[in-house]
UniProtKB/Swiss-Prot annotation:
The lineage of its organism: Bacteria, Bacillati, Chloroflexota, Chloroflexia, Chloroflexales. It holds the Pfam family MutS_V. The gene is mutS. CDD domains: ABC_MutS1 (cd03284). This protein is involved in the repair of mismatches in DNA. It is possible that it carries out the mismatch recognition step. This protein has a weak ATPase activity. One of its GO terms (cellular component) is cytosol. This is DNA mismatch repair protein MutS. Residues 548-559 have a biased composition (Polar residues).
Length: 1085
């Protein structure tokens, strides 16, 4: 705090607690809480992370822990104590509890102890996962209050702990900013180092940004605190008035029915959504272009962003800069693994809007899990990083024909070589999540754990076998994501961050580099000399190099007299683009010598002094022989313990006191106890320590020296272990570029092998891709449905193009499989463009740039949108955004309103897709409006299809076959019976249907003529004429069913409506009936 902030804070405490003397620890707690008022503060006290006041009540309720009370103040001049609510979390289980808090949408600040008391010096308990890398300092002077500070602020998008995020999914932090019709979007996964940015412009910017956010499914989204992004779900306080119409462009509004409006509805203020939801308001000054530009330059250690493709994308720069600053602030320091950024354009991949991603169930099924989704079928990966990469491929299909052919070649290699596929997949089981492990190590001791090093070593152990299995095969060029696979200038990775007076970040370079071998050797030489002088447990020498430093300046190379060793291969390593899988054999050799076989989970938990005693297995971080000083401290401590254990028999023999004993307690340490009866035989060099009723306790100078060696050994080993581990982290960081490149190449290999495995299991075929608009599928199957059926899946053929078969109009009964056919065509096209084989006997597919689906709908209560409004909004969007290369899937458009309105909209939509020169795209349209089948006569590129069904013994049998021509019946009553409708209802419905069909006229007028390509003006005339005709008489459906809603009002109908039956006498009723009969016979309808 600044002095002014400190004074304001003290005034606040005085006003809040008048007349109370606050305990020092509570003042410290409130000071830390004031700096992080929007976070739950976990305050380390002994074995627990404690929460107080309102935080304690919240934590006790959410985590179901005990709520207690603790004294925090006393009344001045009185013996009256004040208590506050308190709830604690055990330090050894903090990771799981924090994950639950963050999962509930809360920010969590971790306050750790950064100074130590004399008593804590002997505390050998391992620290928590959040405190392992903190270098504590000793209390000095009269200050006896342990200092604490917030070392991490954990938010949904900044989690890097492997146990707190799903292994198979990315944990994205996204940033979104809009300005003058343009939108900048950046996202990063701090656990993998992935960092990318894009900028959207034009009328479709909002829709494109929303689609990308849906694809990312970001854990947390940063927006400027005064943003008005106008994106659904990202409103800062209340819902917008007539929100849906404001999101639509003029063209989209013209496609909607006139007069349709969104209800004026205002949500109440929803601050919780910002404070605890996935949207986080970030101060607007953090989005300043100059500030963001400088932040990225320092982060990447470069002088220009041109090489990243960002120079002409100011909003992308601002979004990316906000992510780096937010990450630095929450991590309370640097974010070393964000080494580079990838700029991309919206057209690089197939566009999938949020509705399409949801309707096709690409990543989640109806249950909210991968069960029943496409990824649930295709994900046969063996590594978490492969699973994450496959998810990205599924949500970002390619539009690059060359890359797709290369992907299909790679999958085919694994399909045709079963031995290669099996051996590679078996080996991949042992690799684990190498990508996240390397990224954690790169971030240093504060993040990396000994188990991370062991996991990296175990992964590297599997690579020689993987390289041998692959032989000379390598992944296709361009498929390895090299974002961040470059050596980061150390200054960029370790710059401390501070704020200037105006709030902008100022970065002060701090020159560090990889570990100097000469410095290590010199340190070990000094250690040997000190051991000879028996000074292992003294203070560090003033000239000893600090952890993580070296004798090399930034950008320089080790001097020529640095001897070669396994470590030299990693210093100042530069990533080079090579397609061969690098097994990193030198790194494996280094880690084999540095890290013990079974290290503990955390630093400080090693059992160097107890390993091997009483059968206790070794549990050490540093392997014996790697760090001489650790070995020497262990040897010295064991020698001292041995000397102490042998002291008692020696002294008994030397003094003749048979009851003399050597013992230990925590208060007095080691002592020699002599009974009073032998007081005259005590040697003169014994020094009295304590007088007892039964005797005296003594010590000697020699015992005191060995006692100090034993007592200081454990803490000394903890310090040495932490420093050695930091040097190992530096070495791995120096090779980080190579390791990350290897990890990402393994992920790519894993994906190709997984797609091949899915192809073999599902009997998929390689699709043929073309740079045109054909779509021919022979024996196509739904990849998900066919795996869930107990019976054999019925395949279907479909053939389309934009010249002769542009629109397939599909009719048929309910439950006959119309929706399945629609979805399987879309999924086959999508699978082909991620590089997968497809479930079919053959497939020829012209590249699809966008897939739009309009399948199903439900009310959007939060924004006041009816089912029909949702349906029309989505339909308008796809009509406005589609191109000639798009694929449109429409299911039951128009069913959310009256029959005539719905059918009119459905026909108009079909005509628009068929006739609009900008469109003309491949379209599958399923409907129950059988009248629309007449459109085949007037729209030359529309073809009718139906789902076949037959009747056997009075029962309907769905054949699930797609056949040419329109359907003649819907079999709705049969479906109702299958759904469990009571039999009385079924019988009554059957009676009504038979009556309606009996009363239906035998002939029916033609449907409304469609607008063809060459009859736009004539179409308008015929359309208006049809409307007049429709007003004159009812209409019979093609399948013989009578429409209940087509009857136009005539004289008979009007007379019937005006009759008041209750006022008629029998004679008057008979006369009225006679009049009605005359009118009917005269044709008065």
């Amino acid at each position: 705090m600044t002095p002014a902030e400190r004074r304001a804070f003290e005034r606040q405490l005085q006003q809040e607690f008048p007349g109370l003397e606050l305990h020092a620890w509570y003042r410290q707690y409130r000071s830390l809480k004031a700096a992080h008022p929007d976070a739950i503060l976990l305050y380390r006290l002994g074995d627990f992370y404690e929460t107080f006041d309102d935080d304690a009540k919240l934590v006790a309720d959410l985590l179901e822990v005990t709520l207690t009370y603790k004294e925090f103040a006393s009344q001045k001049g009185r013996d009256q104590k004040q208590r506050c609510p308190m709830a604690g979390i055990p330090y050894h289980a903090v990771e799981g509890y924090v994950a639950r808090l963050v999962g509930a949408g809360y920010r969590v600040a971790i306050a750790e102890q950064i100074t130590e008391t004399p008593s804590s010096r002997t505390d050998t308990r391992p620290r928590s996962i959040f405190a392992a890398g903190i270098e504590q300092t000793s209390l000095t002077g009269s200050n006896r209050m342990v200092e604490r500070k917030v070392v991490r602020v954990i938010t949904p998008g900044t989690i890097i702990e492997s146990g707190m995020i799903p292994a198979e999914r990315n944990n994205y932090l996204a940033a979104l900013i809009a300005d003058h019709g343009r939108i900048g979007l950046a996202y990063a996964d701090l656990s993998t180092g992935e960092f990318a940015a894009v900028e959207f412009s034009g009328e479709r910017a909002a829709q494109q940004a929303q689609g990308e956010l849906t694809r990312l499914n970001a854990a947390e989204i940063l927006v400027p605190d005064r943003a008005d992004l106008r994106l659904p779900g990202l409103e800062p306080s209340s819902a917008r008035l007539e929100q849906d119409l404001e999101f639509l462009t003029r063209e989209e509004r013209e496609l909607l029915l006139p007069g349709e409006r969104v209800a004026r509805r205002v949500e109440r203020e929803n601050n919780a959504r910002w404070a605890h939801g996935r949207v986080t308001a970030w101060p607007e000054r953090r989005w300043d272009l100059r500030n963001a530009h400088d932040t990225l330059l320092h982060q990447f250690g470069v002088r220009s962003l041109a090489g990243f493709g960002l120079e002409d994308r100011p909003l992308a720069i601002r979004a990316a800069g906000a992510i780096v600053q937010y990450a630095r602030e929450t991590q309370q320091g640097v974010v070393a693994n964000l080494r580079s950024i990838r700029a991309y354009t919206p057209g690089d991949a197939m566009f999938l809007d949020p509705q399409t991603q949801r309707n096709l169930e690409l990543l989640e099924g109806a249950s909210g899990t991968t069960r029943g989704s496409l990824i649930g079928v295709l994900d046969q990966t063996r590594t978490p990083m492969g699973a994450r990469l496959l998810r990205r491929w599924v949500s970002q299909p390619l539009c690059d024909l060359t890359r797709l052919h290369a992907r299909h070649d790679a999958v085919e290699r694994f399909v045709t070589d079963a031995i290669l596929r099996a051996s590679v997949r078996e080996t991949l089981r042992r690799v684990g999540d190498m990508e996240r492990v390397v990224n954690r190590i790169i971030q240093g001791v504060g993040v990396a754990t000994p188990r991370d090093m062991a996991r990296l070593r175990d992964a590297l152990r599997a690579l020689p076998e993987l390289v041998a299995a692959l032989g000379d095969w390598t992944p296709p060029p361009g498929e390895i994501d090299l974002t961040g696979v470059r050596t980061l200038p150390p200054s960029a990775a370790t710059d401390p961050v501070s704020l200037t007076e105006n709030g902008n970040e100022r970065i002060e370079p701090n020159q560090t580099s990889a570990v100097s071998l000469r410095a290590q050797r010199e340190a070990r030489r000094r250690v040997s000399a000190r051991y000879a002088d028996e000074d292992l447990f003294g203070e560090e020498e003033q000239n000893a190099p600090p952890v993580g430093s070296s004798n090399h300046a930034v950008g320089t190379q080790p001097s020529a007299d640095d001897e070669a060793s396994p470590v030299t291969a990693f210093v100042d390593d530069q990533a080079t683009e090579t397609l061969a899988l690098d097994p990193c054999a030198d790194m494996l050799a280094f880690l084999e010598t540095a890290i013990d076989d079974e290290p503990p989970a955390l630093l400080g938990a090693s059992n160097y002094l107890r390993a091997g005693e009483n059968g206790e297995p070794p549990r050490r971080v540093i392997r014996p022989g790697f760090e001489p000083e650790i070995d020497q401290v262990v040897a010295a401590s064991r020698d001292a313990q041995r000397w102490i254990s042998e002291l008692e028999p020696k002294e008994r023999e030397r003094t003749g006191i048979k009851s003399l004993r050597v013992d230990y307690n925590r208060v007095f340490g080691y002592y020699i106890e002599v009974p009073k009866t032998y007081a005259d035989q005590v040697p003169k060099h014994y020094i009295r320590k304590q007088t007892l009723t039964t005797g005296e306790r003594y010590f000697t100078d020699e015992l005191k020296r060995y006692e100090e060696i034993v007592e200081q050994a454990q803490q000394r080993l903890i310090d040495l272990e932490r420093r050695a581990f930091a040097r190992i982290c530096d070495v791995v960081t120096g090779a980080g570029a190579r390791l990350l490149r290897t990890a990402r190449m393994i992920a790519t290999i894993d994906v190709f092998a997984a797609l091949a495995e899915a192809a073999v299991r599902g009997r998929y075929v390689r699709p043929e891709l073309y740079d045109d608009t054909r779509l021919r599928i022979v024996g196509g199957r739904h990849p998900v449905v066919e795996q869930t059926l107990d019976e054999t899946f019925v395949p279907n053929d479909i053939e389309m193009d934009t010249e002769t078969r542009q629109i397939c109009l599909i009719t048929g009964p309910n439950m006959s499989g119309k929706s399945t056919v629609l979805r399987q065509v879309a999924l086959i096209a999508l699978m082909a463009q991620i590089g997968s084989f497809v479930p079919a006997d053959a497939a020829e597919i012209g590249l699809v740039d966008r897939i739009f689906t309009r399948i199903g709908a439900q009310d959007d209560i939060a924004t006041g949108r009816s089912t029909f409004m949702v349906e029309m909004t989505e339909t308008a969007a796809l009509l406005a955004q589609s191109t000639r290369r798009s694929l449109i899937i429409l299911d039951e458009v128009g069913r959310g309103t009256s029959t005539y309105d719905g059918m009119a909209i459905a026909q108009a939509v079909i005509e628009y897709i068929h006739n609009e020169p900008r469109l003309g795209c491949r379209t599958l349209f399923a409907t129950h409006y059988h009248e629309l089948t007449d459109l085949e006569r007037t729209l030359p590129r529309l073809k009718n299809y139906h789902m076949a069904a037959t009747e056997q013994d009075g029962r309907v049998v769905f054949l699930h076959e797609l056949r040419p021509g329109g359907a003649d019946r819907s079999y709705g009553i049969h479906v109702a019976e299958l759904a469990g409708i009571p039999q009385s209802v079924i019988r009554r419905a059957s009676e009504l249907l038979a009556e309606l069909e009996r009363r239906a006229p035998r002939s029916a007028p033609p449907t409304v003529p469609a607008r063809g390509d060459d009859r736009r003006s004539a179409g308008r005339a015929s359309s208006s004429g049809a409307g007049a005709a429709r007003g004159e008489q009812g209409r019979t459906l093609p399948d013989g069913q009578l429409s209940l809603f087509d009857l136009a009002p005539g004289p008979v109908i009007e007379m019937l409506r005006r009759i008041d039956i209750n006022q008629l006498t029998p004679l008057e009723a008979l006369n009225k009936l006679h009049e009605l009969q005359k009118l009917a016979r005269a044709g008065g309808g």
